[in-house]
Every structure is written in structure tokens, then in C-alpha cells.
UniProtKB/Swiss-Prot annotation:
Transmembrane region(s): none
Coiled-coil portions: 302-462
Modified residues (N6-acetyllysine): 60
Basic and acidic residues biased stretches: 308-341, 507-528, 540-564
Protein name: Ezrin
């Protein structure tokens, strides 16, 4: 029994390990990977590895894994990566898993600066990446520092601005909050829709020379072949759409492209190594096939996948609506609960107030009763004193009468009688005055007793009103509401230093529609506004001395009103011969 070979395949978000047989082909391994991760849009992807000479290479699907120049490690190391890119992510990517893999790969390319991204776009993309990971911003959950361990912005951008890590995070948090209500899958798609407008997005660059020996870059992407000057990867100078190319071939380091226009000369360039031409050929064939496929009616398989994706998306929308409805119901219940708690607290406070008023009234009533009792005792004492004085007065009157009788009946001396009479008269006058004072005092005490009695009656009435008032309604009871292109490539064949491939352009429709495109920022007013705001904010903190060569090129393109698609239209102007002549003249 042959010994199995251990293989590790790293996707953008997982590591997969397999044991394969020595005769396992690249396609069998590839199929095992896509089956494991549930991917059906297999035509974009491939297995990438570093060969035993240290060059990056794509695994050939029609050859045994063990027969290819994979670096001998245990386990063998492969990366599952996008090899080809769609022209328009919103129109072409069907499955969520496909969208996620592209999102993660493009994000890594931007963060590592393999894809140049201007600062304001980097911050906006960072906020979409946060929405894709965390969902809606919630200040109760996403406390300060929740982004501290996240890679969100290219280091180049951070170095160019006088902002701390916290200040970068604050800016991204503000834009994260703006994406409220956006599904995570939709945030990934919005990220890709903006990223695909970046000049270096989806392009494989190769060092080449023209016949004059000028060092240039060849850019191979989903739309065709572009030529760049050596010091500018952002602005292509000449472009050839796939629909203009009928044959591609190479012999050793010489690469020949034959245009459909037979009056035009061959487009010839030279690569530094044979293996570079092999990679260019593979990418040209694969991208051309996808370019043609997109311009023909969808296959039954793709139609079925799109129908299934629409159904799944519709189902997700229904689930989202249900979740939103449930969330709103919960929020309503919470608000009602909070309202009831507030009302309960208010009622409790009112009840406490009633209790305090009742206790105060009872205390006042008790004090008034005590005061009334004291007044009553004083009144009684005054009355008793008045009665005693009245008795004394009456006795004095009787004595006076007696003396008068005695004055008549007895013979006393005039002086003695007069003296006694004067004495008793003075005494009677004093007693009469004392009696009047006591009567006035009795009247005063009777008046004060009457006032106390009136206060007592009033207090009893107030207490009766408080005690008989209906109690505050009890707080309401809270009741919770229940609730991948398959490469049609063969190996290099018997001739290891050359290969030729015919590129058919028959049966396609609207072959240059990409030239009509505009950027996401141009067609989406919200994105345009966000980018302008960010650009204005960042300009105040930018260190102009740290601008890179790409920054200078990008800013100049912006100043002249150029973008990816306007440049594309410009570099494809004129016939094929004119553009090939222009290439040779570089």
C-alpha cells in the first residue's frame, strides 16, 4: 500500500489537512478542497504554492500532485486563492462563500499594500470590514478599544498621517456606525464594489521588454492586457481587450500575441524567464475564457446557481425582516417596561408623599389636641378663679349691707363708721376691678379655646379627606411578550519551451461593454460624499513629506480627472495597429 502524502491547504480563513495518494491529481485535490468548503464557483480559484526553486506557481490540475515541483515539506503546503477576478463583483459573484473568499483576499492585498489604496478609501473600506465582522455598531457592546486588535488600514497610510491608533479607530468607528442595518454579507459586497475600482485590483503584473529593450510591465486582468511604464503600475499606457486577440504563443522567452485585425502586426514582448511566459499564457487563456463566458448566455449550471442564490438571499431577507420585527417588538416591550417602571417609581414617590403628609397631619392634630387640652385646663382654672372672686365680692357686698344695717342699728362713732365704710368701699372697688380683670381673662381664654376648637375641627376634616381619598393605582403588571476557470489548459506538451493557444471570440455579445463603466463613487452619491468627507478630514493630518511614488501618481490622476475606467477607454483608442506601434515606440 503506497504511503499517503500529507497536504495542508490554507484558505483565507481556515486550514485544511488531507492525506492524498501518490497518484492523486491536482484536480482531485482541488475538488476535495472546494467540496469541503462548499464552493461551487470554482472557475475563479486555484491552488497556489512555492516550487522547489522558490518561485510562486499554480498547481496543474491535470497532473499528479507528486509529479509537480512542490517544495518537499511535510505536509505539502498550498494556498487556496483566487486566480482570476470577476469584472463586476455585484453582477458575477453568486455564492456567499465566493464573495467572502474574495473579500478576505482583496482586503489582505490592500492591507499589505500589494494593491495601492488612497487614504480616504482605505478608511472607508476599513469601516465596511468592521461592519462585515461585528455587524451593527452598538455602543453598549462595542466599547472603546474594540478595534485595537484589528488590522484595518495599510501601515503606509498610518505612517503618512499624524494620528494616533486611537484616533484612527475613532474615525473608523464613526463610519462603522453609519452602516447600521447593513448585513455582514452586504458589507463585504460593498467593500468589493469600491475595491474593484482601485487601479491595481485584480491585475497580475509581469516584467517584460519590447523589441527596443525598454523595461515595462505587462498587466493581465479580467478585461485584457495592459502595458505600463516601469515606474507606474497605476496608469496603463496601452490596452488590448480580450476580444481583439485571436492567438497567444511563446517560444522560450519570446511571447507573441496575434490580433484579430490581420492588418495589425503581431504584438511581441520578451519575459526574463521561460516560466514567466508559461504563467502569462495560463492567465491569458483563463481570463479570456471567462471574458467570453460572461458575454454569452449563462449555462444551465450557472442559471441554477443564480436561482438558488436568489432564493437563499430572499430567505435571508425574510429572516432579517423577522429578526427586525422581533427586535422592534422587544424594543417596544423594553420601552413599555421602562415606562411602567418609571410610572411605578412615580406612584411610589406619590405614595410616600401621601404617607408623609398623613403623618405630618397626624402629628399636627396631636399637637393641636394637646394645645386644646392645655387651653381647656387654663380656661377651667380661670373660671374657678373668677367664681372665687365672685364669691368674695358677694361676701363683701353682704358685709357692706350688714355694716350699713349696723350703721343704722348701732350707734357708733361717726369716724369709726366712716373709716370702716371707706375701708370696705375701697376693698369692694379693688375686688370689683379684680373681678373685671378675671372676666376679661376668662373671655380671652374662651376665645383662644374656641380658636383651638376650630383648628381641631379643620385638622380633623383634612385628615378625614386624606384618609378617605382613593389610594394611587397599583403599578401595572409586566407581562413579557412570548415570542471554480477550470483551466482548459493542457501541460506545456512535448515541447517544453513553447506553446500556442487559439482564443476564439465567436458568439459573444457586447464585447466592449466594460468601457462604459463608471466607478462606484461616481454612481453612488453616498460613497462619493463619504470619500470627500474623509479626504477633507485626513488632509489636515497628512504629512506631505511621507507621500509615496504611488501617492503622487494617484493624486495627479485625480487632478486630471482620470479614473480606472476613463483611463481604460483612453488607452484603447485607435485601431490595434496604432496601439502596437505605440507599444514598440515605448
Amino acid at each position: 500500500m503506497p504511503k499517503p502524502i500529507n497536504v495542508r491547504v490554507t484558505t483565507m480563513d481556515a486550514e485544511l489537512e488531507f492525506a492524498i495518494q501518490p497518484n492523486t491529481t491536482g484536480k482531485q485535490l482541488f475538488d476535495q478542497v472546494v467540496k469541503t468548503i462548499g464552493l461551487r464557483e470554482v472557475w475563479y480559484f486555484g491552488l497556489h504554492y512555492v516550487d522547489n526553486k522558490g518561485f510562486p506557481t499554480w498547481l496543474k490540475l491535470d497532473k499528479k500532485v507528486s509529479a509537480q515541483e512542490v517544495r518537499k515539506e511535510n505536509p505539502l503546503q498550498f494556498k487556496f486563492r483566487a486566480k482570476f477576478y470577476p469584472e463586476d463583483v455585484a453582477e458575477e459573484l453568486i455564492q456567499d462563500i465566493t464573495q467572502k473568499l474574495f473579500f478576505l483576499q482583496v482586503k489582505e492585498g490592500i492591507l499589505s499594500d500589494e494593491i495601492y489604496c488612497p487614504p480616504e478609501t482605505a478608511v472607508l473600506l476599513g469601516s465596511y470590514a468592521v461592519q462585515a465582522k461585528f455587524g451593527d455598531y452598538n455602543k453598549e457592546v462595542h466599547k472603546s478599544g474594540y478595534l485595537s486588535s484589528e488590522r484595518l488600514i495599510p501601515q503606509r497610510v498610518m505612517d503618512q498621517h499624524k494620528l494616533t491608533r486611537d484616533q484612527w479607530e475613532d474615525r473608523i468607528q464613526v463610519w462603522h456606525a453609519e452602516h447600521r442595518g447593513m448585513l455582514k454579507d452586504n458589507a463585504m459586497l460593498e467593500y468589493l464594489k469600491i475595491a474593484q475600482d482601485l487601479e491595481m485590483y485584480g491585475i497580475n503584473y509581469f516584467e517584460i521588454k519590447n523589441k527596443k529593450g525598454t523595461d515595462l510591465w505587462l498587466g493581465v486582468d479580467a478585461l485584457g492586457l495592459n502595458i505600463y511604464e516601469k515606474d507606474d503600475k497605476l496608469t496603463p499606457k496601452i490596452g488590448f481587450p480580450w476580444s481583439e486577440i485571436r492567438n497567444i504563443s511563446f517560444n522560450d522567452k519570446k511571447f507573441v500575441i496575434k490580433p484579430i485585425d490581420k492588418k495589425a502586426p503581431d504584438f511581441v514582448f520578451y519575459a526574463p524567464r521561460l516560466r514567466i511566459n508559461k504563467r502569462i499564457l495560463q492567465l491569458c487563456m483563463g481570463n479570456h475564457e471567462l471574458y467570453m463566458r460572461r458575454r454569452k448566455p449563462d449555462t444551465i449550471e450557472v442559471q441554477q446557481m443564480k436561482a438558488q442564490a436568489r432564493e437563499e438571499k430572499h430567505q435571508k431577507q425574510l429572516e432579517r425582516q423577522q429578526l427586525e420585527t422581533e427586535k422592534k417588538r422587544r424594543e417596544t416591550v423594553e420601552r413599555e417596561k421602562e415606562q411602567m417602571m418609571r410610572e411605578k417609581e412615580e406612584l411610589m414617590l406619590r405614595l410616600q408623599d401621601y404617607e408623609e403628609k398623613t403623618k405630618k397631619a397626624e402629628r399636627e392634630l396631636s399637637e393641636q389636641i394637646q394645645r386644646a387640652l392645655q387651653l381647656e385646663e387654663e380656661r377651667k382654672r380661670a373660671q374657678e378663679e373668677a367664681e372665687r372672686l365672685e364669691a368674695d365680692r358677694m361676701a363683701a357686698l353682704r358685709a357692706k349691707e350688714e355694716l350699713e344695717r349696723q350703721a343704722v342699728d348701732q350707734i357708733k362713732s361717726q369716724e369709726q363708721l366712716a373709716a370702716e365704710l371707706a375701708e370696705y368701699t375701697a376693698k369692694i372697688a379693688l375686688l370689683e376691678e379684680a373681678r373685671r380683670r378675671k372676666e376679661d381673662e376668662v373671655e380671652e381664654w374662651q376665645h383662644r379655646a374656641k380658636e383651638a376648637q376650630d383648628d381641631l375641627v379643620k385638622t380633623k376634616e383634612e385628615l378625614h379627606l386624606v384618609m378617605t381619598a382613593p389610594p394611587p393605582p397599583p403599578p401595572p403588571v409586566y407581562e413579557p411578550v412570548s415570542y471554480h476557470v477550470q483551466e482548459s489548459l493542457q501541460d506545456e506538451g512535448a515541447e517544453p519551451t513553447g506553446y500556442s493557444a487559439e482564443l476564439s471570440s465567436e458568439g459573444i455579445r457586447d464585447d466592449r461593454n466594460e468601457e462604459k463603466r463608471i466607478t462606484e463613487a461616481e454612481k453612488n452619491e453616498r460613497v462619493q460624499r463619504q470619500l470627500l468627507t474623509l479626504s477633507s478630514e485626513l488632509s489636515q493630518a497628512r504629512d506631505e513629506n511621507k507621500r509615496t511614488h504611488n501617492d503622487i501618481i494617484h493624486n495627479e490622476n485625480m487632478r486630471q480627472g482620470r479614473d480606472k475606467y476613463k483611463t481604460l477607454r483612453q488607452i484603447r483608442q485607435g485601431n490595434t495597429k496604432q496601439r502596437i506601434d505605440e507599444f514598440e515606440a515605448l
